[in-house]
Amino acid sequence: MRTKLTIATHAILTILEIIALVYDIYSFGIAMFSYYTIDSNILQMLVSAGILYCLLKKKEGTIPVWLSKAHLVSAVALTVTFLIAALVLAPQEGFSYYFLENVAPINHFLAPVLSVLSFLFLGIGEKLPKKAVFAPVDATLLYGVIVLLLNAVRVVDGPYFFLKVYETAPSTIVMWFGIIAVLCWVLSAIYCWIRRKNA
């Protein structure tokens, strides 16, 4: 039963993420990769497709540790996307844009919910090592550093206010990096703990 639910959930996620990706390519082109939200959703699409492959094609029908770790990264990243959109960006720029228009319901709500629920309660495969808890932090900081550098050399602008190096005080940038890194670690630790309890 769990395997069937996992397959159904990730099939839905894959379809939703493909729809969102097509729209994002049309809307942003190559610039879409500067968005943490879009990167997180692309990762989830790849993770879900990988899980489907493992469960439908491979004889053992289990998910390898590296793929479960990637799912942890996408689940945490999508949660951060939801929280930042809901608590920081939407109050500044409008709720409708971040949660109701175009593919925003997928990127900011449906994908995060399905990703987290499937990671917590539908995990199949070997247990994650304890050090996996740092994977979402590492991935998020890597994204932040890369986009910050691209802002510094004026290749991209933003896309988030705390990445605009020429408009934001260094202390504000450091503060937001710290807040998001801690948030990623806390979410990751909670998710790993709940997943172990439901294994």
Residue ranges and their predicted role:
Residues 102-113, 174-178:
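Membrane-interface loop-to-helix entry segments
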Residues 112-129:
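Alpha-helical transmembrane segments in multipass membrane proteins, preferentially the mid-helix core
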Residues 30-38, 66-67, 94-107, 130-134, ...:
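Non-cytosolic membrane-interface motifs at loop->transmembrane helix junctions
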Residues 154-190:
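Membrane-interface transmembrane-helix boundary segments in multi-pass integral membrane proteins
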Residues 61-77, 129-138:
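Interfacial segments of alpha-helical transmembrane regions
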Residues 57, 189-199:
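Membrane-interface capping segments at transmembrane-helix boundaries
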Residues 1-12, 198:
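N-terminal membrane topogenic signal
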Residues 22-30, 86-96, 152-153:
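Juxtamembrane "helix-exit" motif on the non-cytosolic side of transmembrane helices
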